């Protein structure tokens, strides 16, 4: 009997606390949107997410120099991408892919032929 009563108190108490936390969160969001804090936080998040890797980082990831031909870069890219696909590392695959994209933009802007 005491266990049942205790279980009911715990369930009811957690429901009340859950609703209070939810209402406090909604109120905090409303206050933040009035003061512009939410807008600023969102803009900072977008700004940070939009940062691309530098050419130097891309070259380090792929292990190439400035004098490396586009064909060699593609060979290194394919090898690294496949090796990380076997290991199941999506994070490393995405880093390798972003590095190739960065160098592709650099090669196109230099007019060294259109990378394929």
From Swiss-Prot:
GO terms for cellular component: cytoplasm; mitochondrial inner membrane; mitochondrion; TIM23 mitochondrial import inner membrane translocase complex. The lineage of its organism: Eukaryota, Viridiplantae, Streptophyta, Embryophyta, Tracheophyta. It holds the Pfam family Pam16. The keyword Ion transport does not apply. InterPro entries: J_dom_sf, Tim16. One of its GO terms (biological process) is auxin-activated signaling pathway. Its main location: mitochondrion. Disruption phenotype: Reduced growth, especially at high temperatures (>21 degrees Celsius), as well as warped and twisted leaves at the later rosette stage. Increased resistance to thaxtomin, a phytotoxin produced by Streptomyces bacteria, due to reduced toxin uptake. Enhanced tolerance to 1-napthylphthalamic acid (NPA), an auxin efflux transport inhibitor which blocks polar auxin transport. Increased tolerance to isoxaben (IXB), a cellulose biosynthesis inhibitor (CBI). In single mutants, enhanced resistance against virulent pathogens (e.g. oomycete H.arabidopsidis Noco2 and bacteria P.syringae pv. Induction: Induced by heat, salt and drought stresses. This is Mitochondrial import inner membrane translocase subunit PAM16 like 2. It comes from the Eukaryota. Keywords: Auxin signaling pathway, Cytoplasm, Membrane, Mitochondrion, Mitochondrion inner membrane, Plant defense, Protein transport, Transit peptide, Translocation, Transport. It is found in: Mitochondrion inner membrane; Cytoplasm. It is a peripheral membrane protein. Gene3D superfamilies: DnaJ domain (1.10.287.110). It comes from Arabidopsis thaliana. Regulates ATP-dependent protein translocation into the mitochondrial matrix. Involved in the uptake of thaxtomin, a phytotoxin produced by Streptomyces bacteria, that causes dramatic cell swelling, reduced seedling growth, and inhibition of cellulose synthesis. Modulates polar auxin transport. Involved in importing a negative regulator of plant immunity into mitochondria, thus protecting plants from over-accumulation of reactive oxygen species (ROS) and preventing autoimmunity. Confers sensitivity to virulent pathogens such as the oomycete H.arabidopsidis Noco2 and the bacteria P.syringae pv. Expressed constitutively and ubiquitously, except in root tips, at low levels. Belongs to the TIM16/PAM16 family. Residues 57-106 are annotated as: J-like. Residues 1-27 form a transit peptide. The keyword Transport applies. The gene is PAM16L2.
